[in-house]
């Protein structure tokens, strides 16, 4: 876990707007994420992935949590399907490239969508007739109410066109 005060977010948003966060915490593991409970009670928090779906107009007077948990691996593979696990901090295009490099088809229409893997379920990203829900099995979700990690399967996510349960919750 890396913590910085009065931190520029210029390199953490696609518009490259040079605003500052009162505090910036980079999370590099699931264990660090769970430890946030001890650090952030009653704090104003913004979770930030790749910064491609946010427009900062002024400094952020709170704590920005940058989820930088990396890792992509093939969990299961047979002649019918494959299961690939990708962590929240992975760049979406890098994830697609990993799949294509390993001859795992079905996701190629989703290439070059900006952002990180962790934000893909929020928007139910899609392009050229394919949506995330078409190739999605499950995701681990960090619950900010009790600082626990829960598993959401396809039906739990309530995917709709460019929408999911993650947009509808507080």
Description of each model-found segment:
Residues 142, 149-170:
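Long, positively charged amphipathic alpha-helical accessory segments at protein N-termini or as interdomain linkers
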Residues 1-131, 135, 139, 143-145:
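Anion-binding (especially nucleotide phosphate/pyrophosphate-binding) glycine-rich loop
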């Amino acid at each position: 876990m890396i913590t910085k005060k009065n931190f520029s977010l210029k390199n953490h948003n696609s518009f490259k707007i040079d605003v500052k966060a009162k505090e910036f915490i980079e999370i590099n593991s699931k264990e660090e994420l769970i430890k946030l409970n001890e650090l952030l009670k009653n704090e104003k928090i913004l979770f930030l992935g790749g910064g491609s779906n946010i427009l900062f107009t002024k400094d952020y007077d709170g704590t920005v949590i940058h989820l930088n948990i990396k890792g992509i691996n093939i969990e299961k593979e047979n002649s019918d399907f494959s299961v690939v696990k990708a962590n929240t901090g992975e760049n979406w295009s890098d994830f697609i490239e990993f799949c294509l490099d390993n001859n795992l088809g079905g996701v190629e229409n989703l290439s070059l969508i900006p952002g990180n893997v962790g934000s893909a379920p929020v928007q139910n990203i899609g392009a050229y007739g394919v949506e995330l829900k078409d190739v999605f099995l499950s995701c681990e979700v960090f619950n900010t109410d009790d600082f626990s990690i829960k598993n959401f399967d396809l039906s739990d996510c309530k995917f709709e066109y460019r929408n999911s349960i993650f947009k509808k919750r507080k």
